[in-house]
Regions:
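Well-ordered beta-strand positions in beta-sheet-rich domains
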Residues: 9-11, 45-47, 63-65
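N-terminal signal-anchor transmembrane alpha helix of single-pass membrane proteins
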Residues: 1-2
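A membrane-cytosol interface segment of integral membrane proteins
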Residues: 57-91
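Structural detector for short beta-strands of small beta-barrel domains
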Residues: 5-28
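OB-fold (S1/OB) nucleic-acid-binding surfaces
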Residues: 25-46
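A short, compositionally biased micro-patch
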Residues: 39-41, 51, 69
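Beta-strand/loop nucleic-acid-binding surfaces
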Residues: 43-57
């Protein structure tokens, strides 16, 4: 349950972006989906479904602070300089 999970913020790099169209079975509506894979500093990968606006802002190779709760994406604050982690405002 995401609501009982702790909110965590970790240093992470965008390693993959995925998008596609989901067709709703009953209404046959076509709904776009957007997912991003992040690599943590320990090498582990986490994948989250995100909103289209956030998806457009992220580029493969971006480094920043990923905030999430369980398997729910909250936000990603890109570092101004890709070469080093630094304190940024929380998103």
């Amino acid at each position: 349950n995401n609501s009982s999970a702790a909110v965590e913020s970790v240093d992470a790099t965008v390693v993959e972006k995925k998008q596609g169209i989901y067709t709703h079975m009953q209404s046959e509506a076509h709904v776009p989906w957007f997912r991003v894979v992040f690599e943590m500093t320990d090498g582990s990968l986490m994948e989250f479904q995100i909103q289209q606006g956030d998806f457009r802002e992220l580029e493969k190779g971006d480094r920043g602070m990923l905030t999430y709760q369980g398997n729910r994406y909250i936000c990603y604050q890109k570092y101004k300089f890709k070469s080093e982690a630094q304190e940024e405002e929380k998103c």
